[in-house]
Swiss-Prot record:
It is found in: Cytoplasm. It comes from the Eukaryota. It comes from Schistosoma japonicum. One of its GO terms (biological process) is ribosomal small subunit assembly. This is Small ribosomal subunit protein uS2. One of its GO terms (cellular component) is cytosolic small ribosomal subunit. Its main location: cytoplasm. Gene3D superfamilies: Glucose-6-phosphate isomerase like protein, domain 1. InterPro entries: Ribosomal_uS2, Ribosomal_uS2_CS, Ribosomal_uS2_euk, Ribosomal_uS2_euk/arc, Ribosomal_uS2_flav_dom_sf. Keywords: Cytoplasm, Ribonucleoprotein, Ribosomal protein. PROSITE patterns: RIBOSOMAL_S2_2 (PS00963).
Amino acid sequence: MSGGYPALELSAEDLRLMLAAHVHVGETNMNFQMSTYVHGRTKDNFHIIKLDKTWEKILLSARAIAAIDTASDVFAIGSRPFSQRAVLKFANYTGATAMAGRFTPGAFTNQKQSCFREPRLLVVSDPLSDHQAVMEASSVNVPLIALCNTDSPLTRVDIVIPCNNKSTHSIAVVWWFLAREVRRIRGEDTRLQQWSVLPDLFLYRDPNEEEQNVEDPEDARLEPVIPGADAEAAETWGVEPSMPVGSLGDMGIAAPGYGPVGGTAGGWSNLDADPTETW
């Protein structure tokens, strides 16, 4: 697929990135149509995907996407939570239309729906989880590009990108490669320089982990400066005050442990005296 051009060949850096993201690790099962993309098996019966085939299909898919005149006519679909962030980032950097989350049935076939769309090219993260979009794209003759694992069916798929579509790192790296090659083919970026966008931006982030890592600044200010100060304060909650709080007879409440005060002197020196004047 590189056509003999060294710039289009798989570099050692990109190969190390694929290996680190486990793009080559498939499933234990294999669809017979995916046998051409499988190199062999591991001792754990996991199939190994040929990364040279993966790179060739990424270049082919990027050329097909770049051939569309209007970038928004390319639809990137990812229904699983692990692929939604990668789909949104791909659409952001290539100008495509992202459909992250649940796909509405009839979005490509029912013209009476408010969400009806007419794409010219479809890119899905998994033909199994996105089967509704795959079926509707086939019904309206829309070309389809799919990230396929070793057990994925290739029915209705026009361009296959063999990769591990179950791993969060693998999904992020493949979508990142696809976005980078589309921008390079369009002339938006050059191959002589590294793309400034890192693959980490395409990686799925667990919202529960982020909430646990973020500390509330209000809670940080309320923490006691002296260790054990909160425990000492809690022990004195049930102790009666050493200073009388004054007579509460006028309010109908008797002060615990103290009788009425007969003194009439006011001022700050006599805190137990009742007020002699009204405001």
